[in-house]
Amino acid sequence: MTRSPLHRLIFGGLRRLLYLWVRSETINQSSMTLNLDRSRPVFYALPSPALTDLAVLDHECTKAGLPRPVLPVAVGPLQEPAAFFYLTPDPDWLGRQDKSGAPPTLERLVAAVSQHAEEDAQIIPVSVFWGQTPASESSPWKLLFADSWAVTGRLRRLLTVLILGRKTRVQFSAPIHLRELVQHNKGHERTVRMAQRLMRVHFRNLKAAVIGPDISHRRTLVKGLVHAPQVRQAIADEAQRENLPLAKAEAQALRYGNEIASDYTYTAIRFLEVVLSWFWNKIYDGIKVNHIEQVQGIAPGHEVIYVPCHRSHIDYLLLSYLLFRNGLTPPHVAAGINLNMPVVGNLLRRGGAFFMRRTFKGNPLYTAVFNEYLHTLYTKGFPVEYFVEGGRSRTGRMLQPRTGMLAITLRSFLRSSRTPIVFVPVYIGYERVLEGRTYLGELRGASKKKESVLDIFKVFGALKQRFGQVYVNFGEPIRLAGFLDQQQPGWREQDHGPQYRPDWLNAATARLGETVARHLNEAAAINPVNLVALALLSTSRLALDERALTRVLDLYLALLRQVPYSPHTTLPEGDGQALIEHVRSMNLVAEQKDALGRILYLDEGNAVLMTYYRNNVLHIFALPALLASFFLSSSRMSRELLGQYVHALYPYLQAELFLRWTPEQLDEVIDQWLVALVEQGLLRQDNDLYVRPAPSSRQFVLLTLLARTITQTLQRFYMATSLLINSGQNSLSAEALEDLCVMMAQRLSILHGLNAPEFFDKTLFRHFIQTLLQQGVLHADAQGKLGYHDKLGELAEGVAKRVLSAELRLSIRQVALHRDDGLETSTL
């Protein structure tokens, strides 16, 4: 553009036109401190072709009295039409660049200086930055177009100039003297490469200092994936299986890699930080973080895998935001391919998301590429985040772990255990989830809808509500090597080839998933909404007098302070009255005043929604509620009998709620809770007997409300066992029993007015049946029909009559005996 007088004339006009809008300055007055030898010719090196960058450079050179880059210059007999060159060639319209080869101007300069000993040329590397540094920029709109490490096309460059041109900065760097390089006598080609390398490293380091480091591995990693031995073998197998040329199968593997891989950019991280800072402090009342210091202590020297619970779509962004704000590297986040939507998907990818398909079944090439991608992340030490629950919990409970990602992680660690892997559980608790109303529909039986970009905008309609606070608790880390030492001693001595899949792997993976789930529950953040939901949903009319509700909340807080669930569990600040006022301000409870005071209650919509928040902390109260349940139908009970019944029910509660204690630890915890219940007046101890309060007393009401928090869970257990016993030995398959349990639960919920749709959640019944099989209480014959041990009758009647009222047991037995399921038992 500037190689002839006419071109220079046109260029001058364009520069003046550009500066009608653009304003530029040099960084740290770098143009004034170059220490140039004015007797030697000066050339300018720009990192990549951009006419706007050249115009800004020419403008700043004119301001500083430096030689202009667009004017001719001579080096001995060599006459150059302009005093600048680009280190990389011009990109095409798609933004693609061929970085091979050296700039012709540099080739000629090295030749001229080499051939004429008295000559030298000074090359000044110049970098032009559009807009402020990402760390200083506060406008999310401007951050979208800020300088990044990605190669950009002309359209984006135009938008960058228009949006960021008022704050353009130029960095002049110390000149490189070609004479000094030539004096190394490395020959022409090596000297040219040396000069290129010097400038390339310089530009990279300067850019990292100004806009942040290049944290994207996408451009190099994806191509490297197809050269891994496991992927090469999968490519060859794919080509043979599908009768494809090898090149086509390799191209397919590359497409899979690009579909999967994240594309981290510092500017995207800063953009998300700015937007999310507004979001958490305007939509929510901020974020309360606990125990992050332990992560800061273990992150150096470890491959950290964050395993949060999954409650909302914004979980994907929340943890990355918090880690970035606390000086930790944001992780690469596993996201479902359904989130790879227009606009949103690209932003998530640049924020660190990598995308995975819901199933790998029937696609071994995709499986090989994905496994190798994760293995590369782990071995290179990139932090990773994935959700062991798989999808978002619609009920507020911890879902049963999906072990696919854990299995991939375990196999990767067995391949290479040089970098120690540590899992960091992260509990995320919301006082109100953004998708609450969507979950409400699904809780009421609506089918789960596929995510759409429009869902993002639907949420904005609810943003006038108050969403309260977000709580993030970092749980106890799980060191993978130590876990394997416990599960499989001697694993280090086994042959861990790339295809190594030992017999014990599946069982170890399942136990790892359960361990992660337990550690997540241990880190629960109990908030005011959880406790108010727990109290009101335990009443028969979903209502309490304000003074009574205050007493219940004060009791729960006192119990939890006396017997903490775990060192990582956190409690809300304030007393019961403060908790009520907080929940009232969020419009989650309705109220009615009369002459005697204020009654707080749950209306129909909030009653279902509040089951979600109750379920968040149901595991915290499971054991004290179970102990309280034994005193609803018995006025007194011995410590021995209490222990016997708790031990009988505990395996099923532990499996459903991921309770933290082993059977060996249970007696000690039972004693701690009995002491607390006695001190709070809910029980009285008489030697080895524990006695309930008088049925007319306030303490008995409190004991009853505590017991009711676990009643629905115990009802489901009794339903399943009653149906099985009434059907007889080897009459029902597990699937048929599940279906009957769901129908029975739906009928009972109508008869008893239960407003809790998860009461007839099929997955809860399925898991209970699986636990009965694991405990040896049930067994399946060759046809899949279920037989049962005598212990089932003891569990169904001996224990149930202690924790469920006679009326409730009778109602369940009647439905079980007179069921009209439309199916003959013999055909099930």
Swiss-Prot record:
Catalytic reactions on record: sn-glycerol 3-phosphate + an acyl-CoA = a 1-acyl-sn-glycero-3-phosphate + CoA
One GO CC term on file: plasma membrane
The enzyme's E.C. designation: 2.3.1.15
GO terms for biological process, alphabetical: CDP-diacylglycerol biosynthetic process; fatty acid metabolic process
The UniProt record lists the keyword Transferase: yes
GO MF entries: glycerol-3-phosphate O-acyltransferase activity
Cell compartment(s), UniProt: Cell inner membrane
Membrane topology classification: Peripheral membrane protein
Pfam families, alphabetized: Acyltransferase, GPAT_C
CDD domains xrefs: LPLAT_DHAPAT-like
NCBIfam families hit by this protein: plsB, PRK04974.1
Protein name as catalogued: Glycerol-3-phosphate acyltransferase
Organism: Pseudomonas putida (strain ATCC 700007 / DSM 6899 / JCM 31910 / BCRC 17059 / LMG 24140 / F1)
